[in-house]
Amino acid sequence: MTGIPSIVPYALPTSRDLPANLAQWHIDPERAVLLVHDMQRYFLRPLPDALRDQVVGNAARIRQWAADNGVPVAYTAQPGSMNEEQRGLLKDFWGPGMKASPTDREVVDALAPQPGDWLLTKWRYSAFFNSDLLQRLHASGRDQLILCGVYAHVGVLISSVDAYSNDIQPFLVADAIADFSKEHHWMAMEYAASRCAMVITTDEVVL
């Protein structure tokens, strides 16, 4: 069966749950960009209310920190109502996807893009695919990417791998991402910490 599965409530990770990081990078506001990944109504709708509220709340805290510290903010958002060519192989795993209506496409109010933010159309798992994200990072002299959003083991993780592959240091914010299950969430954290990224908490970003 294609599409986003039913999601059972689970507790977000705390600092005690994080896997050991191999890399020892540190966020520098002069080098970083925040990526708000796919926080559209369509993708957040399947999440249990408490989980959704926590993830959105933590992402909003990071969004405010970015604004306060001059850190650019990038958003990915699928366009909705893709035709067959645009949808490609996504349809074999996820079905037709979202509609282009605001009830599906809009980023949730608490994280709504602001003037000057980078708006990227999302076509595949990676935020870098068929977008100018890498060019924007290079043009702004930024080589760190802080990631929050959904879904952890799909687009968030693949975007982290793509950042790493382009010598951009990814920081995966463990309690500002969500997934289909605790197992998927933990798998994404463990892979990221051991293969491509730093896994950190919201407090480590904003405090």
Swiss-Prot record:
GO terms for molecular function: isochorismatase activity. Keywords: Antibiotic biosynthesis, Hydrolase, Virulence. Coiled coil: none annotated. GO terms for biological process: phenazine biosynthetic process. It catalyses: (2S)-2-amino-4-deoxychorismate + H2O = (5S,6S)-6-amino-5-hydroxycyclohexa-1,3-diene-1-carboxyate + pyruvate. The keyword Transcription regulation does not apply. Belongs to the isochorismatase family. This is Phenazine biosynthesis protein PhzD. It comes from Pseudomonas fluorescens. The gene is phzD.
